[in-house]
């Protein structure tokens, strides 16, 4: 059996917040409890959104919390580079592979045009409107006319894809409901769906623990794993954290960033203990180091309900 390998792959577009740390901690615990290797990767493929100056502070925050990694941007490893922006040649090879199998086609639709298609069914939550197949039905003449005016994106033809392992009935429904999906944007940027599959496969990731918001992406990724001849990892999706305003934790919750919490004098043990209690690993919040929590980790202990960080809970961080 292959050694367990997990990862945490943040986008360096803002400071880490408690929601990011929740996923990072649980993923790290899963790997360390299983005696595996933990990889840190920066998902900076969308260069306009990414800020290199945030990578160092992100790693400092994770170390401060008590997390470490066996491979990553700061120490390298045999599966690098650990920045997506330095792995573009690998994504191009994957695109070529899919094109050779005739699984991709050019799409000239804009986001506005897709939103205007009232008959389109509800799509995939992480990607927006479902694609109605407009450009898949173009004649050669129509395609040539559009190509003369606009650079296309590349879409994966779902109905031509292979049978994917680990896909249950619910995932099959999600896959069909979302329609054909983009693997390369018109501006040349590789999609998250393709990049994350290539990275996880080539880095030998066996287990992916991530937020529930990415569940909808899983069937598309399973399809790409199958099409590229890769073995898919095991996926676990954990509930999201919500701020006192009832909205999912995001960069707008600046007072819940780790930088802000650290600046207020909070100890890492308090954060770890609170996140452990919220996850269901321990009964009530108590100061703990990340290492002390390793024996407590069991997937079956993890809560399946969304988590609200109310004012009372946040006071425990003071």
Swiss-Prot record:
The keyword Zinc applies. GO terms for cellular component: cytosol. ATP binds at residue 251. It holds the Pfam family tRNA-synt_1c. Zn(2+) binds at residues 107, 109, 131, 135. One of its GO terms (molecular function) is ATP binding. PROSITE patterns: AA_TRNA_LIGASE_I. Keywords: Aminoacyl-tRNA synthetase, ATP-binding, Ligase, Metal-binding, Nucleotide-binding, Zinc. The keyword Ligase applies. Its EC number is 6.1.1.-. Binds 1 zinc ion per subunit. L-glutamate binds at residues 7-11, 43, 192, 210. A motif ('HIGH' region) lies at residues 10-20. SUPFAM superfamilies: Nucleotidylyl transferase (SSF52374). Its cofactor is Zn(2+). Gene3D superfamilies: HUPs. InterPro entries: aa-tRNA-synth_I_CS, Glu-Q_tRNA(Asp)_Synthase, Glu/Gln-tRNA-synth, Glu/Gln-tRNA-synth_Ib_cat-dom, GluQ/Sye, Rossmann-like_a/b/a_fold. One of its GO terms (biological process) is glutamyl-tRNA aminoacylation. A motif ('KMSKS' region) lies at residues 248-252. It is an enzyme of class 6 (ligase). Belongs to the class-I aminoacyl-tRNA synthetase family. GluQ subfamily. PANTHER family: GLUTAMATE--TRNA LIGASE, GLUTAMYL-Q TRNA(ASP) SYNTHETASE. Catalyzes the tRNA-independent activation of glutamate in presence of ATP and the subsequent transfer of glutamate onto a tRNA(Asp). Glutamate is transferred on the 2-amino-5-(4,5-dihydroxy-2-cyclopenten-1-yl) moiety of the queuosine in the wobble position of the QUC anticodon. This is Glutamyl-Q tRNA(Asp) synthetase. It comes from Shouchella clausii (strain KSM-K16) (Alkalihalobacillus clausii).
């Amino acid at each position: 059996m292959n050694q367990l390998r997990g990862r945490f792959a943040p986008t360096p577009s803002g400071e880490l917040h408690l929601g990011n740390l929740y996923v990072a901690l649980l993923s790290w615990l899963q790997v360390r409890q299983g005696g595996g290797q933990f990889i840190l990767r920066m998902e900076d493929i969308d260069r306009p959104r990414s800020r290199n100056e945030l990578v160092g502070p992100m790693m400092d925050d994770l170390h401060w919390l008590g997390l470490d990694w066996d491979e990553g941007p700061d120490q390298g490893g045999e599966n690098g580079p650990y920045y997506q922006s330095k792995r573009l040649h690998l994504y191009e090879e994957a695109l070529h592979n899919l094109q050779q199998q005739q699984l991709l086609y050019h799409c000239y639709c804009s986001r506005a045009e897709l939103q205007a298609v009232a008959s389109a069914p509800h799509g995939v939550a992480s990607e927006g409107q479902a694609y109605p197949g407009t450009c898949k039905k173009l004649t050669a003449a129509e395609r040539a006319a559009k190509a003369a005016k606009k650079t296309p994106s590349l879409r994966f033809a779902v109905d031509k894809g292979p049978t994917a392992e680990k896909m249950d009935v619910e995932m099959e429904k999600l896959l069909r409901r979302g329609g054909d999906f983009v693997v390369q944007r018109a501006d040349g940027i590789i999609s998250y769906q393709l990049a994350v599959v290539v990275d996880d496969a080539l880095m030998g990731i066996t287990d992916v623990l991530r937020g529930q918001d990415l569940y909808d992406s899983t069937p598309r990724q399973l399809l790409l794993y199958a099409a590229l001849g890769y073995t898919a990892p095991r996926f676990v999706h954990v509930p999201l954290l919500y701020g006192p305003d009832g909205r999912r934790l995001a960069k707008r919750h600046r007072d819940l960033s780790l930088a802000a919490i650290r600046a207020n004098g909070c100890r890492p043990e308090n954060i770890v203990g609170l996140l452990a209690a919220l996850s269901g690993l321990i009964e009530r919040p108590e100061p703990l180091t990340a290492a002390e929590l390793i024996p407590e980790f069991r997937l079956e202990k993890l809560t399946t309900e969304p988590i609200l960080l109310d004012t009372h809970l946040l006071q425990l961080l003071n």
